[in-house]
Amino acid sequence: MEELILSIVKPLVDHPEDVVITPEETDTSLTYKLSVSKEDMGRVIGKQGRIAKAIRTLVYAVGSKNDKKIRLEIIE
């Protein structure tokens, strides 16, 4: 899953070396925390959050095969 997120996000940003994904797992969910540089935050979120929503939709669709709920948080 991390490879999928990286393959989507890295081409969008100017500083791909600053892209970091941190997984956090609980009994019922798996949360991926995506961190990008401040300069690239707008590119990842997009106008009215459209790009972020599209990334989340793909992650949720792929993760729906698991028993755990998958979440993606974009943090600074």
From Swiss-Prot:
KH domain span: 29-76
Subunit organization: Forms a complex with KhpB.
Location in the cell: Cytoplasm
Signal peptide: none
GO MF annotation list: RNA binding
Function: A probable RNA chaperone. Forms a complex with KhpB which binds to cellular RNA and controls its expression. Plays a role in peptidoglycan (PG) homeostasis and cell length regulation.
Entry's Gene Ontology cellular component terms: cytoplasm
A biological process from GO: regulation of cell shape
Name this protein carries in UniProt: RNA-binding protein KhpA
InterPro entries: KH_dom-like_a/b (IPR015946), KH_sf_prok-type (IPR009019), KhpA (IPR020627)
Coiled-coil stretches noted in the UniProt entry, renumbered to this chain: none
Keywords for this protein: Cell shape, Cell wall biogenesis/degradation, Chaperone, Cytoplasm, RNA-binding
Family of the protein in this entry: Belongs to the KhpA RNA-binding protein family.
Pfam family, one: KH_KhpA-B
Superkingdom of this protein's organism: Bacteria
Chief location of this protein within or outside the cell: cytoplasm
Organism: Listeria monocytogenes serovar 1/2a (strain ATCC BAA-679 / EGD-e)
